[in-house]
């Protein structure tokens, strides 16, 4: 099992290219099930979750060609992948594959819309709280589907003639459930109105792609999305938007280690709340023609309190990274997690590096320390793993992060990108 070794103390200076967003790429890939034509996606990141989803889609009948060929391209950050699903050959999504990644559960929407029935395993993925599927079930039921849970699977069936447009308001905001209901509604009869919809850029990206395929979606990016159903969708070509979580992660790494880095192929507008929070913490951030520049030279890190919220609030997927940054602040800060009820698993590992963090319910109190000291630590989930890398960049001595398969699910060549900017980061294969 691979490990990441970090020797702390070096500033970061240089250019880091930002990859396509994993959280956008996955639903876009799943949307290929909605059409018999070819969906071409550009700027697809090379990540473990993407590779796994390609296997899952292949089981359903999707032919996948990477960069126009069927061999894998290992030497590029940005890949173009063609997805063609002439016929859906299997409407069952097995536990063996779905349990490995929660987002693969989202195939339930397109399979139900196109074939009228499917059998999908209950999901797995990150061990962050319960993350129930109730919202998915309620949303699809509103479109006329019958849903039955049996032996760990959901058996879903559309009414005769297909799904039927409806008005439905989610009781709480859910990005995944918004993705699924929006995809399913594109082929439903009539008009669907989704209330309390997720407003994340990744939802907008999916809507833009679906519209390019012939869907009629308006309101994406607001709390109310309207979908006029169509009889079929065609192929399209779409570029995956930049990864705002990767952007924020590297921005926090620079704020932690110090230095001057340009993040290319990204957009400050994708994470304005996080950028403003970093400015309050002492980082200098400015827009460039193709991204953003972040500097922290000499100035200390100021304590800042945050509360995670759905977009446009502070992203829960940057909470662990920001907590790592606050361990070196000049005072006391508080991090309150409102999205998931069990997303502080990185706290005990940061404590191994010398962080002073105490928990009270969904709030963490961080007392900044003058120095962190390297130690062996263990990744517990995707975002927690990268928070340990960020802490290691500023820790004295050597930090070794184990179980980095979590890291490979969401960060493309992290050690290579950091090393190019002067960090001492290496992967150790065992």
UniProtKB/Swiss-Prot annotation:
One of its GO terms (cellular component) is cytoplasm. It is found in: Cytoplasm. UDP-N-acetyl-alpha-D-glucosamine binds at residues 102, 131-135, 172-175, 317, 339. Coiled coil: none annotated. Its EC number is 2.5.1.7. The modification 2-(S-cysteinyl)pyruvic acid O-phosphothioketal is found at residue 126. Keywords: Cell cycle, Cell division, Cell shape, Cell wall biogenesis/degradation, Cytoplasm, Peptidoglycan synthesis, Pyruvate, Transferase. Phosphoenolpyruvate binds at residues 22-23. The active site is at 126 (proton donor). Pathway: Cell wall biogenesis; peptidoglycan biosynthesis. GO terms for molecular function: UDP-N-acetylglucosamine 1-carboxyvinyltransferase activity. Disulfide bonds: none annotated. Pfam families: EPSP_synthase. One of its GO terms (biological process) is peptidoglycan biosynthetic process. It catalyses: phosphoenolpyruvate + UDP-N-acetyl-alpha-D-glucosamine = UDP-N-acetyl-3-O-(1-carboxyvinyl)-alpha-D-glucosamine + phosphate. InterPro entries: Enolpyruvate_Tfrase_dom, Enolpyruvate_Tfrase_sf, MurA_subfamily, RNA3'P_cycl/enolpyr_Trfase_a/b, UDP_GlcNAc_COvinyl_MurA. Belongs to the EPSP synthase family. MurA subfamily. NCBIfam families: murA, PRK09369.1. HAMAP family: MurA. Cell wall formation. Adds enolpyruvyl to UDP-N-acetylglucosamine. This is UDP-N-acetylglucosamine 1-carboxyvinyltransferase.
